[in-house]
């Protein structure tokens, strides 16, 4: 039997401090998170090709807009998770898929995601298909301080989802640029 000298608290510290101090560790943790997110999607029978297309398009827009909107690498991870998981609620209900997506994400542990991160991904997944300030019965509650980030992520995923509405991945090339304060999307199929 081999016993390590590490305590539980050492593991928790490594989980939270490691990514900030060690780039190799951060890359490995991100790889593990992405693998887990794909496993969650597969568990709920998501459309892999559509999810990856929405991810690709949303991240292309994020990469161009992030600096001007004050969004960092961690926000990029949240956009990526939202893009990949935005439709998992269809496993339960096609009609109310966004609500079930919210509930499934909230009830799932995602390595390296705080409860707040999970809530942001769940809310952005919900609002990718619903009006942000629509006060429908059964809508999840959102804290005021989360609204700006959730709105930005939901908008990116909503637009990326609309660009693959056919679920056929017709857009092969997507270039995003900013001109005179306007976002231009050049897409080729």
What are these regions (language model features)?
Residues 181-188:
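Short, aliphatic-rich beta-strand segments
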Residues 16, 83, 187:
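Flexible glycine-/small-residue-rich
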Residues 29-32, 111, 186:
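Short, surface-exposed, polar/charged, turn-prone segments marking secondary-structure boundaries
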């Amino acid at each position: 039997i081999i016993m390590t000298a590490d305590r539980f608290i050492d593991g928790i510290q490594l989980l939270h401090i490691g990514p900030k101090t060690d780039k190799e560790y951060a890359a490995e943790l991100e790889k593990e998170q992405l693998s887990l997110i794909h496993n969650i999607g597969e568990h709920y029978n998501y459309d892999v090709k559509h999810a990856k297309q929405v991810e690709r398009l949303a991240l292309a827009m994020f990469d161009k807009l992030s600096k001007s909107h004050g969004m960092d690498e961690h926000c990029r991870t949240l956009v990526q998770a939202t893009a990949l998981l935005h439709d998992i609620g269809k496993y339960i209900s096609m009609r109310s898929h966004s609500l079930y997506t919210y509930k499934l994400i909230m009830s799932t542990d995602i390595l390296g995601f705080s409860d707040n991160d999970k809530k942001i991904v769940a809310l952005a997944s919900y609002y990718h298909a619903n009006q942000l300030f629509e006060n429908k019965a059964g809508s999840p509650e959102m804290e005021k301080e989360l609204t700006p980030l959730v709105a930005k992520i939901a908008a990116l995923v909503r637009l990326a989802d609309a660009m693959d509405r056919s679920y056929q991945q017709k857009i092969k090339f997507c270039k995003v640029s900013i001109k005179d304060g306007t976002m231009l999307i050049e897409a080729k199929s």
